[in-house]
């Protein structure tokens, strides 16, 4: 039965042993505190005794008898006595200073006694706390609570605030005697507060118990006696601001708070080791801070150590920043300067024009002889492949590019540079861009107005070899001056040369039509006008001809759909000359062109969504080529030449904005004005004796603004995407050109109608170039004005395949002979 009662005894002992242990530690703490206070009082008494003794010595020295005795001794050569007196005088001065310090310290000692009483009470309350909890407390390691918290009751607050001035003065004057100096310089050779004196007393009396004392004093409200020996050295060093101008000495009331501020250099350097505040607590002082009493070598070593510690993360951070910046620069859009940045080398990856919506790559076959200067090299890069990849997202930036290229080509107009390029590059690019790859070189070549050529353009039946010839032609023609036009003519295809007789050109092997009048017109080049347009409007820049070819039936195969637009009669399509317009408005020509440069082009994507299906419809207006018979050519050579000149203008692709996006469109004309203008035009045509089925040249005052680059007509380039319609009107007779417009993939009665280019023109030639819709749907009763001149035939009803928007516009001007059939 004995083991049974023995079992609860160890359990009770285990329960009571922590309490007894804690009580024992509390008692020992109180005992050590009492002994420390007694030692302090003993030290004060000793100082008082020393003071009294020194006073006696001073009085004895200063008495008259002693002075005379001293003088006599000095005369007799009692040197040891005189030296002793000097030593005593020095001690007296030191003791006076020490007394002043002790007077100030008395108040501090009283406050320290109160603090010790509070800590003893705290120890009695927190007896049941374990050592692990006290050790893992993170507040002492922060250096804030024990050094700067004014309400925490810590010793360091009072000591730093009360004794900082005293200790700094005492240390500078070395007022303490040897035992006190050893106590105050125990930690790092620097003068400390009265807490160091207490620590020294404790260290002298009980060295073996200092560990527990420090651990117990590292409670939430601990004094700085233990902290002074164990804290991180950065809390005991001088503060140097980052700019190096301000230096704060160590004993200052706000030192602990300032150390934690990022404004100071030492806190930044100390952060490297601040990750482990409790493990690395006993680092040397020369690792992280500057102690005034240490060696200069140690200071330099500490600074080198700190700089080496800080340089590693700084260099890695710089490398990381550079890497991030390089990635950002690669991904970011390039800064678009005024001039396009081109390269003259033959590397295809480097010769990219990174400007706006243009991307012209330079192939390996580029001849380097053209790179005479920067401007010629830019033109070489532009014409090297004859390809333009139009970016639909950045087309508003073309305004600046077009202005820049305009001025560049004006300067390089007199610098001929002829180059030919292999055709394999064009074949490679044709699969990407279909037939959009020649407009830029065509427009620039025509803008020179210097090479006289003629040809017919078959728009869609383009073979790779034909595209190769086209690129050769465009690149060799763009920089040719008038004097060199006949010398360079062997570079051109056979059918492009200028011959006096009219030759019949087959539409299958003709690609391009260059023409210019022999009277050279000083017109600035207009090359970047159509850069932002769609593929349909880009293609139409090629559909201009110079000579009239007899009528023939021809089919145009479209890109995206396999429909054919059959053209039976193309003998009545008529292009007007604008030679008179250029002569009359010669001073306004440059003004008009500079204004048109600023007009932005609209892509088909900007239009309504119900018209996107109609993107494939290409205009047949310019495919129906006007023709002259040899008799007419011989009879009116000036008119032929002026006609060729006017069609050179119409080669520049004219783009149109939708009406709701343009602010300068014109008003609708009244029916009286339309009737008067139409009757006047018919009277002029009949006065010139036009023949059946043959286009006569229109007199000079009626030049077409839609064949001119300054026109901004909605019908000139983007009509198929705006309206997508086929307007077929009846003619009054065979001689009347009062006929139709055919646009797109019409499946209505095209085989019964005639093509008239006049209905797409307007006699109004002001700069705004807006659309007058009534001139395109000329179905108003104009017969009343011209009844005497026109032969009347039976009226036939017309079927119009129109969209909803077109129907609304036609309904405003409908007549009795118009039947609307809306198919969309």
Swiss-Prot record:
Residues 84-139 form a coiled coil. It holds the Pfam family Dapper. GO terms for cellular component: cytoplasm; nucleus. A motif (PDZ-binding) lies at residues 821-824. PANTHER family: DAPPER HOMOLOG 1 (PTHR15919:SF12), DAPPER-RELATED (PTHR15919). Involved in regulation of intracellular signaling pathways during development. Specifically thought to play a role in canonical and/or non-canonical Wnt signaling pathways through interaction with DSH (Dishevelled) family proteins. Binds to dvl2 to regulate the degradation of beta-catenin (ctnnb1-A and possibly ctnnb1-B), thereby modulating the transcriptional activation of target genes of the Wnt signaling pathway. Seems to promote beta-catenin degradation if not phosphorylated and to block beta-catenin degradation if phosphorylated by CaMK1D. Residues 2-343 are annotated as: Interaction with tcf7l1-A. Residues 16-33, 520-530 have a biased composition (Basic and acidic residues). Its main location: cytoplasm. Keywords: Coiled coil, Cytoplasm, Developmental protein, Neurogenesis, Nucleus, Phosphoprotein, Wnt signaling pathway. Named 'dapper', an antonym of dishevelled, because it acts as an antagonist of dvl2/dsh. Belongs to the dapper family. Phosphorylated by CaMK1D; the phosphorylation requires binding to dvl2/dsh. It comes from Xenopus laevis (African clawed frog). The lineage of its organism: Eukaryota, Metazoa, Chordata, Craniata, Vertebrata. It is found in: Cytoplasm; Nucleus. The keyword Lipid metabolism does not apply. Expressed both in the dorsal lip in early gastrula and throughout the posterior presumptive ectoderm in early neurula. Expressed in the dorsal neural folds at the tailbud stage and highly expressed in the tadpole head, including the brain, retina and cartilaginous branchial arch derivatives. This is Dapper 1-B. Interacts with dbf4 and tcf7l1-A. Interacts with dvl2/dsh; the interaction is required for dact1-b phosphorylation by CaMK1D and seems to become disrupted by the phosphorylation. InterPro entries: Dapper (IPR024843). It comes from the Eukaryota. One of its GO terms (biological process) is negative regulation of canonical Wnt signaling pathway. Residues 1-33, 131-150, 515-534 are annotated as: Disordered. The keyword Zinc-finger does not apply. The C-terminal PDZ-binding motif may mediate interaction with the PDZ domains of DSH (Dishevelled) family proteins.
């Amino acid at each position: 039965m004995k083991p049974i009662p023995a079992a609860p005894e160890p359990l009770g002992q285990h329960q009571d042993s922590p309490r007894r242990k804690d009580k024992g530690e509390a008692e020992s703490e109180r005992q050590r505190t009492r002994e420390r206070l007694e030692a302090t009082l003993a030290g004060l008494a000793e100082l008082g005794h020393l003071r009294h003794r020194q006073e006696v010595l001073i009085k004895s020295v200063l008495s008259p008898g002693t002075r005379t005795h001293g003088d006599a001794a000095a005369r007799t050569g009692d040197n040891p006595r005189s030296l002793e007196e000097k030593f005593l005088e020095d001690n007296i001065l030191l003791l006076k200073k020490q007394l002043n310090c002790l007077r100030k310290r008395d108040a501090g000692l009283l406050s320290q006694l109160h603090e010790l009483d509070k800590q003893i009470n705290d120890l009695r309350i927190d007896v049941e706390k374990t050592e692990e909890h006290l050790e893992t407390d993170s507040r002492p390691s922060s250096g804030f609570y024990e050094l700067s918290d004014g309400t925490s009751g810590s010793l360091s607050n009072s000591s730093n605030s009360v004794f900082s001035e005293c200790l700094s003065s005492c240390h500078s004057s070395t007022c303490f005697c040897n035992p006190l100096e050893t106590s105050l310089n125990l930690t790092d050779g620097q003068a400390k507060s009265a807490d160091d004196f207490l620590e020294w007393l404790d260290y002298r009396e009980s060295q073996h118990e200092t560990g527990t004392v420090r651990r117990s004093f590292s409670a939430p409200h601990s004094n700085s006696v233990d902290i002074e020996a164990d804290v991180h050295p950065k809390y005991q060093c001088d503060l140097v601001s980052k700019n190096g101008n301000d230096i704060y000495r160590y004993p200052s009331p706000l030192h602990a708070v300032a150390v934690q501020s990022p404004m100071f250099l030492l806190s930044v350097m100390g952060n490297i080791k601040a990750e482990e505040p409790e493990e690395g607590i006993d680092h040397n002082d020369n690792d992280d801070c500057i102690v005034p009493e240490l060696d200069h070598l140690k200071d330099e070593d500490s600074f080198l150590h700190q700089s080496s510690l800080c340089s590693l993360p700084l260099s890695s951070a710089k490398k990381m920043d550079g890497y991030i910046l390089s990635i950002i620069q690669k991904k970011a859009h390039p800064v678009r300067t005024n001039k396009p940045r081109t390269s003259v080398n033959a590397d295809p990856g480097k010769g990219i024009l990174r400007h706006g919506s243009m991307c012209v790559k330079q192939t390996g076959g580029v001849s380097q002889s053209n790179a005479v200067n920067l401007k010629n090299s830019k033109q070489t890069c532009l014409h090297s492949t004859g390809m333009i990849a139009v970016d639909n997202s950045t087309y508003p930036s073309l305004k600046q590019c077009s202005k820049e290229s305009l001025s560049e080509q004006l300067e390089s107009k007199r610098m001929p540079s002829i180059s030919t390029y292999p055709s394999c590059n064009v074949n490679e690019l044709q699969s990407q861009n279909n037939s959009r790859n020649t407009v830029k070189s065509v427009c620039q070549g025509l803008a020179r107005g210097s090479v006289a050529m003629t040809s017919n353009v078959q728009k869609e039946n383009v073979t790779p070899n034909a595209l190769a010839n086209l690129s050769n032609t465009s690149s060799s023609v763009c920089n040719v001056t008038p004097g060199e036009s006949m010398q360079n003519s062997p570079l051109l295809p056979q059918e492009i040369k200028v011959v006096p007789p009219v030759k019949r050109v087959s539409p299958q092997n003709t690609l391009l039509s260059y023409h210019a009048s022999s009277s050279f017109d000083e017109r600035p080049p207009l090359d970047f006008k159509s850069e932002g347009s769609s593929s349909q409007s880009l293609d139409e820049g090629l559909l201009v001809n110079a000579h009239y070819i007899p009528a023939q039936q021809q089919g145009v195969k479209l890109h995206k759909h396999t429909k054919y637009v059959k053209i039976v009669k193309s003998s009545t399509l008529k292009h007007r000359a604008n030679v008179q317009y250029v002569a009359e408005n010669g001073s306004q020509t440059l003004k008009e062109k500079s204004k048109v440069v600023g007009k932005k082009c609209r892509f088909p994507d900007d239009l309504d969504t119900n018209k996107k299906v109609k993107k494939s419809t290409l205009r047949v207006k310019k495919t129906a080529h006007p023709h002259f018979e040899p008799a007419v050519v011989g009879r009116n050579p000036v008119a032929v030449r002026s006609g060729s000149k006017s069609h050179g203008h119409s080669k520049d692709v004219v783009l149109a904005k939708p009406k709701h996006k343009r602010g300068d469109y014109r008003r609708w004309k009244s029916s009286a004005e339309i009737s008067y203008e139409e009757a006047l035009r018919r009277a002029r045509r009949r006065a010139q004796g036009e023949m059946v089925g043959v286009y006569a040249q229109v007199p000079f005052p009626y030049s077409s603004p839609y064949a001119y680059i300054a026109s901004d007509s909605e019908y000139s380039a983007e009509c198929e995407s705006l309206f997508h319609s086929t307007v077929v009107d009846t003619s009054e007779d065979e001689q009347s050109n009062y006929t139709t417009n055919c646009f797109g993939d019409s499946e209505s009665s095209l085989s019964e109608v005639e093509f008239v280019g006049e209905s797409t023109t307007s006699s109004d030639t002001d700069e705004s170039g807006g659309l007058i819709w009534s001139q395109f749907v000329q179905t108003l009763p104009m017969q009343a004005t011209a009844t005497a001149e026109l032969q009347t035939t039976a009226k036939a009803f017309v079927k119009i395949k129109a969209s909803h928007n077109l129907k609304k516009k036609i309904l405003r001007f409908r007549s009795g002979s118009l039947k609307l059939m809306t198919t969309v």
